């Protein structure tokens, strides 16, 4: 493998860490150190633009690709730099890129901390060729730059003229139809889109225009709705008048019937003296009934006052001698084994009627049978049903719950039973109406 003479002449690089090949203004390549900045998550790099559009993103990617292509082996750089045609083409491409970027933004390149001690030197023959070709390149570049500047000025002037024409047309449209103007969002692309051919306007007759037809259809529809509303209002008015007329007829007919009924009454055969005598009898009965009720109430109050003035022994003797008369007193019957109990109730027992004097303790339905001969397991209520009982009766069953709080022998329970519990204290005094204060 042959090594180029230019590389042989270069002094050896002691360390290439952090060094990248950089091309200077003369087209020479040298290794320069760059300042490596620390990467911070979520922070924008220094070389990245603050704001960018789609066109700038594409240009930024193009610059990255161009830089990647520059970082090639030094052998290919030496071969390309020796050819003046390739060098002129590269310089022209780089100038185009720089000119395009200058119109948009400025690319921040990596900061150069320092340069290497030795730079790459070309051979004498290549240096002479470069000096001779630089003058030709400068002349070509000046002409090219002047031509491009003229084209850019012409393009800018054309764009400005078009914008003025569009603004004049929009101003005329706004003055003619201010009520129908609406805000629209328009998207403009590059100059190529603006230079597209415009369509020729076509005249449309007024009767064939869609907006006029829609306006006429809307007016016709509104007119139909108004006519329908008037028709509905007229129908409601007629219906209301009909209801009022019917109500008036009903009132007239009712008045006629009442007058006919009054005329049908025959008062010729009435006797005023008989009516007066009947009225006197009714009034006498009412007076007698009121007097009896008043005397019974006074008698009851006097009896209550007399019983209150009696002593305890006299009251007991009085009750034994004159027992309380109970209306519809029930006969205490004997219930059979597992017989169902029916409660007579306490309402309306003050009325003396035969139905309230029946024996409610008499057996009914299946209670007529003797259930003592049944097996022990069947001697329960509702046997074989969902409402059956657990025990036959609670006479031989101890249902005391010894785990309950009130069944425990504690100081708190003992104090409660001695002081507050009813039926467990040795007190046989008659309770008074007023509550005694306990200390």
Curated annotation (Swiss-Prot):
A single Gene Ontology CC term: microfibril
Gene name in the database record: MFAP1
Name of the featured protein: Microfibrillar-associated protein 1
Modified residues (Phosphoserine): 52-53, 94, 116, 118, 132-133, 361, 432
Protein family per UniProt: Belongs to the MFAP1 family.
Cell compartment(s), UniProt: Nucleus
Residues recorded with modification N-acetylserine: 2
Lineage of the organism: Eukaryota, Metazoa, Chordata, Craniata, Vertebrata
Protein task: Involved in pre-mRNA splicing as a component of the spliceosome.
Record bears the keyword Transmembrane: no
Origin species: Bos taurus (Bovine)
Cross-link for Glycyl lysine isopeptide (Lys-Gly) (interchain with G-Cter in SUMO2), residue positions: 67, 249, 357, 371, 381, 415, 418
Biased composition (Acidic residues): 71-81, 112-122, 131-144, 178-195
Biased composition, class Basic and acidic residues, residue ranges: 23-34, 61-70, 145-163
């Amino acid at each position: 493998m042959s090594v180029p003479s230019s590389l042989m002449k270069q002094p050896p690089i002691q360390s290439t860490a952090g060094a990248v090949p950089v091309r200077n203004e003369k087209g020479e390549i040298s290794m320069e150190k760059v300042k490596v900045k620390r990467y911070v998550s979520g922070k924008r790099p220094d070389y990245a633009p603050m704001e960018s559009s789609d066109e700038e993103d594409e240009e930024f990617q193009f610059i990255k690709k161009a830089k990647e292509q520059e970082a090639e082996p030094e052998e290919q750089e030496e071969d390309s730099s020796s050819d003046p045609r390739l060098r002129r083409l590269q310089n022209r491409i780089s100038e185009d890129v720089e000119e395009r970027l200058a119109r948009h933004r400025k690319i921040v390149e990596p900061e150069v901390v320092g340069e290497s001690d030795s730079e790459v030197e070309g051979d004498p023959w290549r240096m002479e060729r470069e000096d001779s070709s630089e003058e030709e390149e400068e002349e070509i570049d000046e002409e090219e730059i002047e031509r491009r500047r003229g084209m850019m000025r012409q393009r800018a002037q054309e764009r400005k003229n078009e914008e003025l024409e569009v603004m004049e047309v929009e101003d005329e449209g706004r003055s003619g139809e201010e009520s129908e103007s609406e805000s629209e969002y328009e998207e403009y692309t590059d100059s190529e889109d603006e230079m597209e051919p415009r369509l020729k306007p076509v005249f449309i007759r007024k009767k064939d225009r869609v907006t006029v037809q829609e306006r006429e259809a809307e007016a016709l529809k509104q007119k139909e709705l108004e006519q329908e509303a008037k028709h509905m209002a007229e129908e409601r008015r007629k219906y209301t008048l009909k209801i009022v007329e019917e109500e008036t007829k009903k009132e007239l007919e009712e008045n006629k019937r009442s007058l006919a009924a009054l005329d049908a009454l025959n008062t010729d055969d009435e006797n005023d003296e008989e009516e007066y005598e009947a009225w006197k009898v009714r009034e006498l009965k009412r007076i007698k009934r009121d007097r009896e009720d008043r005397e019974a109430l006074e008698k009851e109050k006097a009896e209550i006052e007399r019983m209150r003035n009696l002593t305890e022994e006299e009251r007991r003797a009085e009750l034994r001698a004159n027992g309380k008369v109970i209306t519809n007193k029930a006969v205490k019957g004997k219930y059979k084994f597992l017989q169902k109990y029916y409660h007579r109730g306490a309402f309306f027992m003050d009325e003396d009627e035969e139905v309230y004097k029946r024996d409610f303790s008499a057996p009914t339905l299946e209670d007529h049978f003797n259930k003592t001969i049944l097996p022990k397991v069947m001697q329960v209520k509702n046997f074989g049903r969902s409402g059956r009982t657990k025990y036959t009766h609670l006479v031989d069953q101890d249902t005391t719950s010894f785990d309950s709080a009130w069944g425990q022998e504690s100081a708190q329970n003992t104090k409660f039973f001695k002081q507050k519990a009813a039926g467990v204290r040795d007190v046989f005094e008659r309770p008074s109406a007023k509550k005694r204060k306990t200390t």
